[in-house]
Regions:
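A short, hydrophobic C-terminal helix/tail in secreted or cell-surface proteins
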Residues: 328-334
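Nucleic acid-machinery interaction/catalytic patches
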Residues: 1-327
């Protein structure tokens, strides 16, 4: 059975040919490209102009006029804005954890293309609702406190108190922080992604085709990015899934995401390539009473089962902690 990356290499070569110099492959991470190049090389006995390849995060960074900021510097810059807006005397040490949390929230806001003004306005309304129960009878108050139990007055920790007290400042902090970072030419990842989408000129892109391979759940900024390239006729999509999730099970969670992706961005590969789960499997169970027993069995299994380097590359071992120290050499280091 051909692997997903083999199918992609074969299909891409059939459609574009030997010269892939104006093509870039975009993967969720960097590892997949190592295997893809081997499969692509096997498609022809002639020299091939290999495509460029990068992760989605690398692609956004290349398209951005800003640089990804160092995590420590990002927190320090946020701390400056925080001090100015709140007049807080909190030290940087005390603020650091809270700063990382807030940057993570801002990152989610931008990656999901949320209207920040509306979001933080709604958060302030929620705070007011939770802080003032005078218009509710006792039963209604208890019901609301149960629903928002993580934020209820009785359960508030010091960290939550600090967070809630700043809700009315979050919108201002968010905008000022982004403005300051823009002046410095740096950004946190979500800000960088969002700026790319808002400023993207598809007529000035470096490559003729952007090949997106093996993605799954997309955030809104990725979806918008895919749509912009699709509209410019610069995108091709290869989705890895199985018909078991999209056809056999009604409303399976994984199937919902896959079907949405397939509807928005049709797959270059036919459905017939993705009907594997229903085929017979050869599954062997090994009884091991403890994790140490599993660890002792692994070297024996690797040496008796995987006889060639190619077999090693086509198999994976999911490691628990004790297994990390018992994998046989030299195969575990290649």
């Amino acid at each position: 059975m051909q692997s997903f990356l083999q199918l992609v290499a074969h299909d891409l070569y059939a459609k574009i040919g030997n010269d892939l110099s104006r093509t870039v492959l975009v993967f969720p991470n960097k590892r997949a490209n190592l295997f893809f190049n081997e499969h692509l090389a096997g498609e022809s006995d002639q020299p091939i102009w290999s495509p460029a390849a990068m992760s989605i995060s690398d692609l956004f960074r290349k398209l951005s006029v800003q640089k990804a900021g160092d995590p420590i510097r990002l927190v320090c810059e946020l701390y400056k804005v925080f001090r100015e807006e709140t007049e807080s005397q909190e030290t940087l040490d005390d603020f650091y954890f809270w700063g990382e949390l807030l940057i993570s929230d801002f990152d989610d806001v931008d990656k999901n293309l949320v209207d920040a003004d509306k979001l933080f306005s709604n958060l302030q309304d929620l705070k007011n609702l939770m802080d003032d129960y005078e218009f509710l009878d006792k039963e209604q108050e208890e019901a609301i406190q149960q629903f928002f139990q993580n934020f209820s007055i009785e359960r508030r920790t010091v960290l939550k108190e600090k967070f809630i007290s700043l809700w009315d400042k979050l919108g201002t902090i968010y905008h000022r922080y982004r403005e300051n970072l823009a002046e410095l030419g740096i950004a946190y990842e979500g800000m960088l992604y969002r700026n790319v989408i808002e400023q993207l000129d598809t007529t000035r892109l470096k490559y003729d085709k952007y090949i997106f391979v093996g993605f799954n759940v997309l955030n809104k900024v990725e979806t918008k990015f895919f749509q912009l390239l699709q509209d410019a006729d610069k995108a091709m999509f290869y989705w890895d899934y199985d018909l078991f999730y999209t056809k056999q099970i009604v409303k399976h969670e994984a199937g919902e995401f896959i079907n949405r992706n397939l509807k928005l961005f049709p797959n270059e590969l036919p459905e017939s390539c993705f009907d594997t789960l229903r085929k017979p499997k050869n599954i062997r169970y090994i009884s091991a009473s403890t994790e140490n027993a599993q660890a002792r069995f692994l070297p024996e299994w690797v040496q008796s089962t995987l006889s060639t380097a190619n077999e090693e590359k086509e198999n994976a071992v999911v490691l628990c902690n004790c297994l990390l120290y018992t994998s046989p050499s030299p195969r575990d280091t290649r």
